[in-house]
A protein has these predicted regions:
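Short Gly/Thr/Asp-enriched flexible loops that form oxyanion-binding sites at enzyme active sites
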Residues: 22-27, 108-121, 181
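Accessory alpha-helical/coil subdomains and C-terminal extensions
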Residues: 38, 103-105, 115, 122, ...
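Short beta-strand elements at the ligand-binding edges of bilobed clamshell
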Residues: 136-146, 260-266
Length: 323
């Protein structure tokens, strides 16, 4: 017999991503429409362990759909990685009458949800990360906005790079995954895209390509560098020293996490948030919602975490042929 759900908790965990507020709003209002109570858990799993738990109603999420960041705040929590921390979290949920939790975050957040599910707290995960590095889904909340933010910034860097006939290295977020770099590289028509999944650490070869392009008459050169490759400032110095071409590095940093979410992030996050509540009301647990092959679907968290993600090879190939 399915466990009856009366009160649903919602939290955001790990790095913030534009669209998280749209997801929170959808969870709250969809739950209320089904006669459920909602409690917001502030600062992720750290807030759960500290019992930073607040009642939420429709007004709690008014005028939040267009806001970046997360109204519940977020944090990373080492204590929750331990079995003791997880047990404490489950007991706190029961103490506050929380039957189920919607967890918005990445793979690490899903691992926490997985542990809570095993301890009797029904959980649904929503993919919230600007990095698009969750294998079970083609879309993650915040990726679209982050790409648009980076793309617009890179356009501006290209303007000045063209004026000064420079080589410009623009570093975007993505420690273990180069999806922002790949998408922006194509969107901005970059001459070079450096991905952690593909970079061979051959700075000499990169310098040769920059020099060769200048020899062919190319007056500026845009390199999009994922932070997982990094060392942008050092690369710029090496390129300039070897070629004589003025080279500057720009690190976009945390601006990619901020800003009002795009239409796509608002709509997809809303659908995912509502779907999470629907699944919980059906008695489902230990699931993660994904957008796969054009459809919103759900996977067992264990299955989702076991999946591996690879770079879209065709996108990477054409990024080189279209230079």
């Amino acid at each position: 017999m399915a466990k009856e759900i009366n009160t649903i908790g919602v939290l955001t965990s790990g790095g913030d991503a534009p669209g998280m507020n749209a997801a929170i709003r959808a969870v709250v209002r969809q739950a209320l429409s089904k006669g459920k109570k909602v409690k917001g858990i502030k600062r992720g799993y750290a807030g759960l362990l500290n019992e930073e738990i607040v009642d939420m109603d429709s007004k709690s999420v008014s005028d939040t759909i267009s806001r970046g960041g997360t109204i519940l705040q977020t944090a990373r929590c080492k204590e929750f990685v331990t079995a003791e921390g997880q047990q404490k979290g489950a007991e706190i949920c029961k103490k506050h009458g929380i039957d189920a939790i919607v967890v918005i975050g990445g793979d690490g957040s899903f691992q926490g949800a997985q542990k809570l599910a095993a301890l009797g707290i029904n959980t649904i995960g929503l993919p919230g990360t600007i990095d698009l590095d969750i294998a079970c889904t083609d879309y993650t909340i915040g990726f679209d906005t982050a790409c648009n933010t980076a793309m617009e910034a890179i356009d501006k860097v290209r303007d000045t790079s063209t004026s000064h006939e420079r080589c410009s290295i623009i570093e975007v977020m993505g420690r273990g995954a180069g999806y922002i770099a790949l998408w922006c590289g194509l969107a901005n028509g970059a001459e070079e895209i450096l991905l952690p999944e593909k970079y061979d650490n051959s700075l000499k070869a990169l310098i040769e390509r920059v020099a060769h392009a200048r020899g062919l008459g190319k007056q500026h050169y845009i390199i999009i560098n994922a932070e997982g490759v990094g060392h942008s400032q050092e690369m710029a110095k090496e390129i300039e020293a070897a070629t004589g071409i003025e080279t500057r590095a720009t690190i976009l940093g945390h601006m990619q996490r901020g800003g009002s979410p795009s239409c796509k992030d608002r709509v997809y996050a809303t659908i995912m948030g509502a779907m999470a509540v629907d699944l919980l009301c059906e008695g489902k647990s230990n699931r993660v919602i994904a957008h796969k092959d054009g459809n919103f679907v759900d996977f067992d968290i264990d299955e989702a975490l076991a999946m591996k993600k690879s770079v879209a090879e065709y996108m990477y190939d054409i990024s080189k042929s279209l230079v």
